[in-house]
Design a protein with these regions (language model features):
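Helix-terminus/linker motif at the lipid-water interface of multi-pass membrane proteins
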Residues: 31, 35-57, 126-134, 190-194, ...
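Transmembrane alpha-helix boundary and packing residues in multipass membrane permease domains
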Residues: 26, 30, 42, 82, ...
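Small-residue hotspots at the loop-to-helix junctions and early N-terminal turns
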Residues: 53-64, 140, 144, 297-314, ...
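Small-residue-rich hydrophobic transmembrane alpha-helices
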Residues: 56-116, 154-168, 172-173, 290, ...
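Residue-level signal for short hydrophobic patches within transmembrane helices
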Residues: 12, 16-35, 39, 65-72, ...
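Short runs within selected transmembrane alpha-helices of multi-pass transporters and secretion channels
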Residues: 74-77, 146-165, 173-181, 222-237, ...
Length: 487
């Protein structure tokens, strides 16, 4: 009989202690994932100067584009794992299996859709929609075709590790994500540099690449490394789900269940749309900077954004880690009828997230210049990047608070509440303020950074108000899937 994680601590342990015990490994693991991504960016930054700068800019743009698909997938993960955690809290094992399998079918369909879109429309998206120019556009198109075409790997990785977290396992999903990034680092050195040249720290790479006849692929090699690493990591993830968690036991693998899929999509689309709204706001920033502050021969501002957005992703992912913990605690405790514990788990998750993000903000504020110079020593790029850091880092606490409390709310199934909240902040404040910052007389990058920082702070304040005063836990009855008859 496969071993099952016991929900006793989540349902009966001390909330401050257990949210810390469960959430800290997830938050640290998510943060480490972005550290590996920064190392990936370092590998690209050590290509020849005519390629390195545009490549960093291209990665920054493509990260935001591919994040749209990842976030849509994450919405399905958020919905299905909340339902799985609720069923697990009720002790309904058959329901856990049924929701898990149907959610994987939904992720499969999304993978096919975004794979075709990325391969077929990469050029018009990068150059036309975003407004990338010159070498950035050329490299970004090649990169997007590979990383977007292989998007199934990250969709399934998040979905399957999310199921493990919903069942009460915090450390194993983190270790698997770290494994994926270690593989990514190893493969990136081989595929980006090929037989050489390579920086001294990666001198082992060209030796292996030459022995295996691996060509020098430069930026597109980084994309292939990422897709291959994630795909290889799926193997132990599937084995663990089948053997340890017994999710793929007898009777769980069935044909598509329209009623179940509809229930998952009904709950998941607002969560997806919520994060897509956030990502579109970041893409708007990229587009405004690319169109107004760059030329065909000088893409320094785009390169700078490519660097600082990767740093910002660390703060966002740490918050998402605490948010995942909050969602699991809220869902399982609501499933067991413990509303008070559900609410306090969200509060403590937000507090722990805020403390971690203050430490991150201090580190970036103190060491911002050497961090940026680690990737690009160009004076213009360094100046733009460090100005962004100075204006933005302390607002990450507000951004993280919004992410964590929003995730806690989605644990109850109230995904429409989080969607409306994000729409209000982004459409009523961030978008108009960003556009005004660059279109009104005296347009400047610092004014744009100020507008975004204010929006991040507002997000945390608004979510705190919603979490405290809106009756979001009442959505639990609407999200209950047990009323959907099994086939």
């Amino acid at each position: 009989m496969p071993a099952q994680p016991r929900p006793d601590r989540i349902l009966h342990g001390s909330i401050p202690v257990e949210t810390l015990r469960f959430g800290l490994p997830i938050a640290v693991g998510m943060g480490l994932q972005t550290v590996f991504n920064l190392v990936d960016a370092y590998i690209v930054s050590r290509l020849t100067p005519d390629v390195a700068g545009p490549a960093l800019g291209a990665i920054g743009i493509c990260d935001q584009l591919t994040a749209i698909g990842t976030i849509l997938s994450y919405g399905l993960t958020t919905a299905s794992t909340a339902l799985i955690a609720q069923a697990h809290g009720r002790g309904d094992k058959a329901e856990v299996r049924r929701i898990a399998w149907q959610s994987m079918l939904a992720v499969t369909a999304l993978s096919i859709l975004f794979g075709f879109l990325s391969i077929g429309l990469a050029g018009p998206i990068v150059a036309g929609a975003v407004g990338a120019k010159g070498k950035v556009s050329e490299l970004g198109t090649e990169y997007l075709r590979v990383i977007g075409g292989g998007s199934f790997s990250i969709y399934f990785l998040f979905q399957l590790t999310g199921i493990q977290r919903a069942l009460g396992s915090a450390k194993t999903p983190v270790l698997l994500l770290v494994l994926s990034n270690v593989l990514n680092l190893f493969l990136a050195v081989l595929l980006v540099y090929g037989p050489g040249p390579a920086p001294p720290v990666f001198a082992w790479g060209p030796v292996i690449a030459e022995a295996l006849h691996i060509p020098r692929l430069e930026l597109v090699g980084a994309a292939w490394a990422t897709v291959l690493a994630r795909t290889l990591t799926l193997i132990p993830v599937v084995v663990l789900l089948a053997r340890r968690f017994d999710v793929m036991g007898k009777g769980s693998i069935t044909k598509p269940d329209p009623a179940m899929l509809k229930a998952i999509l009904r709950m998941g689309w607002p969560s997806s749309a919520q994060f897509v709204v956030r990502m579109l706001a970041m893409l708007l920033t990229h587009s405004l900077v690319a169109r107004i502050f760059t030329t065909a021969t000088d893409q320094s501002a785009t390169t700078a954004l490519g660097i600082v957005f990767r740093l910002e992703t660390m703060a966002f992912f740490i918050a998402m880690g605490w948010g995942s913990a909050a969602q699991t605690f809220v869902a399982q405790n609501l499933g067991a009828g413990q509303r008070g514990r559900a609410r306090y788990s969200g509060v403590f998750s937000a507090i722990y997230s805020g403390v971690m993000l203050l430490l991150v903000a201090f580190a970036f504020a103190r060491y911002g210049t050497p961090i940026v110079e680690f990737f690009d020593k160009s004076p213009t790029v360094v100046a733009i990047s460090t100005t962004y850091i100075a204006y933005m880092v302390w607002s990450y606490v507000g951004l993280g608070t919004g992410v964590v409390l929003g995730s806690a709310i989605t644990g109850s199934g109230a995904t429409r509440t989080t969607l409306v909240t994000d729409l209000a902040v982004v459409l009523a404040l961030q978008v108009p303020a960003s556009i005004a910052a660059v279109l009104l007389p005296g347009a400047s990058l610092p004014r744009l950074w100020t507008a975004i920082a204010i929006a991040y702070c507002a997000s945390g304040i608004v979510y705190a108000i919603v979490f405290r005063f809106v009756r979001w836990m009442d959505a639990m009855t609407e999200a209950h899937v047990s009323d959907v008859a099994p086939p």
